[in-house]
């Protein structure tokens, strides 16, 4: 089934960036579209459909150039879609695009745990695409994990991402099933109080944490 975004007859999605002087915080309309794209993404069954949603999120980000949350989501979806591309050049192009949006978000919202964590994820994905980057980017990823946790120790996504990474690390390096399970348990606990005034605030990961806990309990 093709995923889609429902709109009112009088509404149209943002088609192009507004003039620089008009690009302020999100309008009610752009925020509404962002929420619809986020909701629709999880119903998509194909990569083509997910990339269609990505283009919509990017249009919202371009129309709300001073809104860090819109920039964040554009970076996030570029990053996670990169994992679906086996071609190295295509994956790297998406990660480069993701990083540009995340850097924009960081320039708008200093020292935000969600943004720092997303940059760590992007760097981790770069290592996945190009393992030879591990020596260079590996320490950066660990430092970004630590910074994200220090900025907001209640952010469940920090513990989820760290926990999942520990699943693939040897025990002698601090990883393994036991260490990963401890982090995922903490993530699930933090998700219980993960509430924000802005409905577009990053909220992903709870289902993934639940899936990982099921796997770790086997």
Predicted segment positions?
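Structural register within alpha-helical repeat arrays
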Residues: 74, 81, 119, 126, ...
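N-terminal leader/linker segments that initiate helical-solenoid repeat arrays
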Residues: 9-73
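Short coil/turn linking the two alpha-helices of tandem helical-hairpin repeats
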Residues: 40-45, 80-89, 120, 125-134, ...
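Terminal, low-structured helical/coil segments at or just beyond the last alpha-helical repeat
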Residues: 13-17, 178-182, 186-218
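Helix-turn-helix repeat elements of alpha-solenoid scaffolds
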Residues: 42-56, 90-100, 134-142, 181-186
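Canonical positions in the second alpha-helix
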Residues: 60, 105, 147-148, 187
């Amino acid at each position: 089934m093709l995923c889609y975004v429902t709109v009112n007859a009088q509404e149209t999605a943002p088609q192009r960036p507004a003039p620089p002087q008009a690009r302020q915080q999100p309008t009610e309309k752009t925020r509404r579209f962002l929420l619809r794209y986020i909701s629709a993404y999880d119903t998509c069954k194909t990569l083509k459909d997910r990339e269609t949603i990505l283009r919509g999120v990017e249009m919202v980000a371009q129309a709300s150039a001073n809104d860090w949350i819109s920039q964040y989501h554009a970076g996030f979806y570029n990053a996670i879609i990169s994992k679906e591309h086996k071609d190295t050049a295509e994956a790297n192009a998406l990660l480069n695009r993701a990083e540009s949006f995340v850097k924009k978000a960081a320039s708008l919202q200093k020292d935000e745990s969600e943004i720092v964590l997303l940059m760590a994820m992007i760097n981790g994905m770069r290592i996945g695409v190009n393992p030879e980057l591990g020596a260079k980017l590996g320490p950066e990823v660990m430092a970004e994990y630590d910074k994200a946790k220090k900025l907001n120790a209640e952010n469940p996504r920090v513990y989820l991402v760290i926990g999942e990474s520990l699943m693939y690390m040897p025990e002698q390096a601090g990883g393994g099933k036991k260490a990963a399970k401890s982090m995922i348990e903490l993530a699930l606990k933090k998700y219980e109080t993960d509430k924000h005034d802005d409905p577009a605030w990053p909220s992903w990961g709870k289902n993934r944490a639940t899936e990982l806990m099921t796997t770790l309990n086997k």
